[in-house]
Design a protein with these regions (language model features):
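Conserved beta-strand signature within the Rossmann-like core of class I S-adenosyl-L-methionine
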Residues: 196-204
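Conserved alpha-helix/loop element of class I SAM-dependent methyltransferases that forms part
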Residues: 69-88
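Conserved Class I S-adenosyl-L-methionine
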Residues: 6, 213-233, 243-291
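N-terminal auxiliary segments of SAM/dcSAM-dependent transferases
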Residues: 1-53
Length: 291
């Protein structure tokens, strides 16, 4: 884990900022200590938490293969543009990040305006400073995914954390918060996002992967309304863009897009897939804090 990211992370026990203590170990001022994995990531889970299902190695591998072939490039470009336009200081926080693919693309486009320190949410610009590159944090419940995310980008740190609980991130640390096909925790999002920050949410629309309906979980037609209801009144909708494109998928591609998400748990391992022309339909929306 990068040392300059640690102050952006919070102890899951007492919520104090983390740092290097006791000869290099990661910990907080109240004496709570956390082991850093050899891959470089941290596990910051609350002591008591609900039993949740995390992505399996098979799901993570399928996602890396599928995204690595560029099939969701329109989403990557849209998120990169949002991050590149961000003006608030702070990190790019990808919640439910998986292996960090979207975060890595976003960081390649990200610079902090006016030379402000890349990770400090409340620092002022040094005299004569120039823009520097953003830092990022990938957060996911899956240790398998986070091990991959720790290697996704040189300017990214990776944390195993529970999206449904208090996020192990200090108040106002995020300039941009990415939520791509992930569960949402609007109370925590409002807490960790900078007052001038942006929340970017990607949700599937009706018709997304429709040609694979027999093998994938269907999209709730009320999903957009439920998104709006879940984020207000803490957030105000700033923009919404519908993206639709056609993907020419090989049999392996179809296997991977089915198995990289929740449908993995509902499809037999020996299912044989055929090449297919498949529609992708998502909404990319941005939201700003109302506080």
């Amino acid at each position: 884990m990068r040392d300059d990211l640690l102050p952006m992370l919070a102890c899951p026990v007492c919520a104090e900022p983390l740092g290097r203590v006791d000869g290099g170990q990661v910990g907080c001022p109240n004496g709570h200590r956390f082991d850093e994995a050899k891959q470089g990531h941290l596990t910051l889970l609350p002591a008591k938490r609900r039993a949740l299902t995390a992505d399996t190695p098979e799901m993570v591998d399928a996602r890396l293969r599928f995204l690595g072939r560029g099939h969701y490039a329109p989403v990557e470009r849209a998120l990169a543009a949002i991050v590149a336009d961000a003006t608030a200081p702070g990190v790019v926080l990808d919640v439910g990040s998986g292996p960090g693919t979207y975060l890595a693309h976003a960081l390649d486009a990200a610079h902090v305006p006016d030379g402000r320190p890349v990770a400090a949410p409340d620092a002022s610009a040094p005299a004569g400073g120039r823009p520097g590159p953003r830092l990022g944090v990938a957060l996911d419940l899956s240790a398998v995914a986070i091990r991959r995310a720790a290697r996704a980008h040189a300017r990214a740190g990776a944390v195993v954390g529970d999206v449904t609980e208090r996020l192990p991130v200090v108040d106002g640390a995020a300039a941009v918060l990415l939520d791509v096909f992930a569960p949402r925790n609007q109370t925590e999002y409002a807490r960790v996002l900078h007052a001038d920050g942006v929340l970017a949410v990607v949700t599937p629309r009706t018709g997304h992967l429709a040609e694979l309906a027999e093998a994938t979980i269907s999209v709730d037609p009320e999903k957009e309304r439920r998104l709006h209801d879940s984020l207000t009144p803490s957030f105000a909708l700033r923009s919404s863009e519908d993206l639709t494109w056609t993907m020419e998928l090989s049999a392996e591609d179809v296997h991977d897009v089915v198995h990289m998400g929740p449908s993995h748990h509902h499809v037999a391992a020996d299912t044989v897939f055929e090449p297919a022309t498949v529609t992708a339909a998502v909404t990319v929306s941005t939201w700003t804090p109302t506080r």
